[in-house]
């Protein structure tokens, strides 16, 4: 903000910062190899991709909307309305229209509790290689494709989570520097 909202100056600040230049590797790999030859301790953790369900759950957690309740009946989360209202053929007839759970506490539970309906896939989760409900899946495919980035930029679910995240930050903090610090902590999981 001090530099007149210049993106070029922001990029320079980020790319020349000590934090950006740090490595995710352990500073003394030899001693770590002696103490933990099988790599079972928490001293080392190689970065990995999040799977579709983890991405949705992380967005709900950051926005403050995640219901952490464990167990219970399956929930019906929000999905793209164009897909929800699409007629589906089941056993020679037409299935009823998909309706998400009416209360946010119900539909914002972890994705592992989401009801899976054959013939109806959530486009957001599908973009990130969630296996279909039609067949068993021994190993997930991992891909990096343009629709993933476009989904994170344009999906209605992502925009709703971003608005809820902004509302959470404004509710918790008073000034701009506190908001930015808290946003950084929450978005990177350091809270």
Enumerate the language-model features and the residues they cover.
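An acidic, gly/pro-interrupted, aromatic-rich
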Residues: 1, 8, 21-187, 191
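Beta-strand segments within the central parallel beta-sheet cores of soluble alpha/beta enzyme folds
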Residues: 9-16
């Amino acid at each position: 903000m001090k530099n007149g909202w210049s993106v070029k100056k922001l990029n320079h600040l980020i790319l020349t910062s000590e934090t950006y230049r740090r490595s995710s590797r352990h500073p003394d790999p030899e001693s770590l190899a002696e103490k933990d030859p099988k790599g079972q301790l928490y001293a080392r953790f190689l970065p990995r991709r999040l799977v579709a369900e983890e991405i949705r759950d992380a967005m709900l957690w950051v926005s403050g909307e995640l219901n952490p309740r464990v167990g219970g009946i399956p929930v019906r989360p929000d999905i793209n309305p164009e897909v929800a209202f699409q007629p589906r053929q089941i056993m020679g007839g037409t299935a009823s229209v998909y309706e998400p759970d009416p209360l946010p506490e119900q539909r914002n539970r972890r994705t592992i509790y989401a009801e899976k309906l054959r013939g109806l896939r959530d486009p957001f989760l599908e973009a990130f290689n969630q296996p279909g409900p039609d067949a068993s899946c021994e190993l997930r495919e991992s891909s990096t494709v343009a629709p993933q980035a476009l989904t994170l930029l344009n999906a209605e679910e992502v925009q709703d989570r971003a608005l809820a995240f902004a509302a959470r930050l404004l509710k918790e903090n008073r000034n701009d520097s506190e908001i930015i610090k808290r946003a950084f902590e929450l978005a990177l999981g350091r809270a």
